[in-house]
Swiss-Prot record:
Residues 76-95, 210-308, 359-379 are annotated as: Disordered. This is Nuclear pore complex protein npp-16. It is a peripheral membrane protein. It comes from Caenorhabditis elegans. Gene3D superfamilies: Pleckstrin-homology domain (PH domain)/Phosphotyrosine-binding domain (PTB). Residues 390-497 are annotated as: RanBD1. Signal peptide: none annotated. It is found in: Nucleus, Nuclear pore complex; Nucleus membrane. Interacts with importin beta imb-1. Interacts with DNA-directed RNA polymerase III subunit rpc-1. Interacts with TATA-box-binding protein tbp-1. Interacts with GTF3C5 homolog tftc-5. Interacts with GTF3C3 homolog tftc-3.
């Protein structure tokens, strides 16, 4: 009879599962390295890599305390079980090792607590590497679950707790010890106080609950600006009588008996004679005028033929408060502006004469042959060009200057361009062709200065040169002729060193 083989404990089984997990990772990394080297160059010698692999396997077995015999037995557990059943031998009962807490963590008063399992106590000085390709540690620590802080106060610690061992599995996960209280079914009381509601609604007005009548309110006339118009809608509106100013003939009215004499003075222009003035009559406005209203000169002869101004007004009452005399010899004529066709004077005939005289004076003031067509387009006066000369200039020319600012060329105006010789050092000077002679450019001729022809005609030059120690200026210079532009470019090429 074969000797009885004791079954492995739970700790040995967990170590075996962990060893298998690490071996699967090691084999995957090993094959990855071998394939990489083989793909790079297939004539590599893999003896060093194989030796490192064997050292890793031996190190893993030493860490998890697994011998070769135990590993071989764990690979075929079912065959051993079948053989034992067929032989009729009794198998010893399986032993379960007690879970021992090795990290020394204090007890937590909460109902449920999860602790990470500790690694085996075996320590190794160093772990071989695949040439800094991968590192295999003793145990991959399980990630700790991040628990949020409880919002309510924890319940009182339970007196009786149950302990359960969880973890492991075929991939060798971390073990955990879970403690459960016997009072899990009871609901924990919360100590958080909910603040009282402080929302305050606005109070209703006094007449909020009072029902308003649908009948329209009677308008009150007291204190109103238009109080005198109150209750006018009840009275029928009457058409007002016309008693104003009119420019037509008066409608026909029953004729009255002609009056013998008119006591109201006539409306005349000029200074009347004392003998012709009638006695003053009472005015409509309550005041007795001492003199009649006069707008011009009047004569005694023009009593019947001259038409009266404002003769179309009513004879009963005048606009100015005087009653007109009865029409005896001449018919009433409407109000007219200008000279009268009957030869009599009009109220506005003097104004027409003044306007005609003003037109004649204006025509006489204009010279002969003058008119609006003779006025040409306004031409601004031209700025006088001053050609300033430089005593030490080797080349001078009158040019039009444009400066490149932003994204376009801006015209500066007409100026004088000089190439000056100062003790063997040449410089380009451009001044405005004015009395002040504003300096637009003063740059030393060096290798940074470039003069380039920019058109087919050859009279435009683009000059690029340093205007200061940190800035470059670009000028467009237009010469009078292409020959002048060529002389300038040749001179720049000669002296720009």
């Amino acid at each position: 009879m074969n000797s009885l083989i004791p079954p492995p404990t739970s700790e040995q089984q967990m170590n075996m599962f962990r060893l298998r997990d690490k071996m699967s990772l090691l084999n995957a990394e090993f094959l990855k390295v071998i394939n990489g080297y083989f793909t790079e160059k297939n004539h590599y010698d893999f003896s060093g890599t194989m030796k490192s692999y064997m050292d890793h396997v031996a190190q893993l077995k030493q860490i998890y305390k697994v011998d070769d015999d135990v590993a071989a037995d764990m690979t075929v557990p079912r065959r051993t079980e079948n053989s034992s059943e067929s032989s009729g031998e009794t198998v010893a009962p399986r032993k379960i090792a007690k879970a021992v807490r090795k990290n020394g963590t204090p007890k937590n008063p909460l109902n449920s607590t999860v602790f990470a399992a500790s690694s085996p106590a075996a320590t190794v000085a160093s772990v071989p590497k695949f040439g800094d390709i991968s590192v295999i540690t003793k145990e991959t620590p399980a990630p700790l679950a991040k628990t949020a802080e409880p919002l309510v106060a924890p319940a009182a610690p339970a007196t009786a707790r149950k302990r359960a061992i969880r973890g492991g599995g075929p991939l060798g996960g971390a073990e955990s010890v879970v403690f459960k209280s016997g009072e899990d079914g009871q609901a924990a009381t919360s100590s958080v106080k909910i603040p009282a509601t402080t929302i305050k609604f606005p109070e209703p007005t006094k007449d909020f609950w009072t029902k308003k009548s649908d009948a329209p309110a009677a308008p009150s006339n007291s204190g109103s600006l238009f109080a005198f118009l109150g209750k006018d809608g009840d009275k029928p509106k009457e058409t007002p009588k016309f008693s104003g100013f009119s420019f037509g003939k008066k409608p026909a009215e029953p004729s009255e008996e002609p009056k013998a004499a008119d006591s109201t003075p006539k409306l005349t222009f000029g200074s009347p004679k004392e003998a012709d003035l009638p006695k003053p009559a009472s005015s409509l406005f309550g005041a007795s005028p001492s003199k009649p209203l006069v707008f011009g000169g009047s004569s005694a002869d023009s009593t019947t033929s001259a038409p009266k101004p404002f003769s179309a007004l009513s004879t009963a009452a005048s606009l100015f408060g005087s009653s007109s005399a009865s029409t005896t010899t001449t018919a009433t004529q409407p109000l007219s502006f200008g000279s009268s066709s009957t030869g009599g004077s009009s109220l506005f005939s003097g104004f027409a004469g003044l306007a005609q005289k003003a037109m004649e004076n204006q025509n006489q003031a204009k010279p002969e042959g003058s008119g609006e067509d003779d006025e040409g387009e306004y031409v601004p006066p031209k700025v006088e060009t001053v050609e300033n000369q430089e005593p030490d200039a080797v080349l001078s020319s009158k040019v039009s200057v444009f400066k490149f600012t932003g994204k376009e060329y801006t015209k500066l105006g007409v100026g004088m361009l000089h190439i000056k010789d100062n003790d063997g050092k040449f410089s380009v000077l451009i001044r405005a062709a004015t009395a002040t002679g504003t300096v637009w450019l003063n740059s030393l001729c060096n290798k940074a200065m470039k003069a380039t022809v920019v058109d087919a005609k050859g009279d435009r030059i683009r000059l690029t040169c340093p205007s200061s120690s940190t800035e470059m200026a670009t000028m467009m210079i237009r010469f009078g002729t292409a020959d002048g532009a060529k002389k300038f470019t040749d001179k720049i090429l000669e002296v720009a060193v």
